[in-house]
Swiss-Prot record:
GO terms for cellular component: cytosol. PANTHER family: DELTA-AMINOLEVULINIC ACID DEHYDRATASE. It comes from Streptomyces coelicolor (strain ATCC BAA-471 / A3(2) / M145). This is Delta-aminolevulinic acid dehydratase. InterPro entries: ALAD (IPR001731), ALAD_AS (IPR030656), Aldolase_TIM (IPR013785). The active site is at residues 203, 255. The gene is hemB.
Amino acid sequence: MTTYGSFPGARPRRLRTTPVMRRMVAETRLHPADFILPAFVREGVSEPVPIAAMPGVVQHTRDTLKKAAAEAVEAGVSGIMLFGVPEDGKKDAAGTAGTDPDGILQVALRDVRAEVGDELLVMSDLCLDEFTDHGHCGVLDGQGRVDNDATLERYAEMAQVQADAGAHVVGPSGMMDGQIGVIRDALDQIGREDVAILAYTAKYASAFYGPFREAVGSSLKGDRKTYQQDSANARESLRELALDLEEGADMVMVKPAGPYLDILAKVAEASDVPVAAYQISGEYSMIEAAAEKGWIDRDRAILESLTGIKRAGARNILTYWATEVARTLR
């Protein structure tokens, strides 16, 4: 007599027999609308500048950034997250280029909004690290430590100028205590109630950021372990989530993605707002480097990595492959 609850009656391989069978029963599907494209725009360049540590990624000119945004729209990507790279001479201790209405990030926001309108969610990184001469995500006190509350005042200014420049969404990435509430209040005070906040809720002090530091021309000396999270900790991410939601976050994010899928799953289970994850520069570069050596199948590895992030609970994924993968999926 056949026993159907176990072998030989139960044969899970039946659902793996053909590509169409596997496709039909797949629990997780990637879609172009899942993706957000991170993009760097550099001040004072006439040609895109390749980023050596991130093969295939560039620091855009204003014109090539507009082209990249248009291509993202055509591919069905949902959003673009902009990072500004100012000229070195414009960096200072307070990161004033980050709040200059004519600074590179604000100019780029206006450019992209003029190019794509509301066809693409235009997002802006809200942090000081690209604009400070010390490379930290905030202003420093007399002892050289990041001053949390003084930094919040700068973040409020940044939020307002980014919203005025056309950002649909601001992404506070500095991991300062209280940043979401301060930014929400600052936006509401100038009538920007419709501008959403994507909170970098669980952002870890990770070695995988290495290539990104080149991408934004970071001046950082030391580390960010006094404000970004310790990679050994999981429960504090849920505390950060509760605080961000209480302060008014519209969406939340886990960063990095791949090494922190357990955190992503916990946050996704606990959150009542959309959850994003950022597949960061080191994740990107590892796959590209291994594929260049012929050690892995590049295209399969990209899709597998993104599927794993979505399977763990991400509604949206920031990835440097956003446009490429979206085209593949269409």
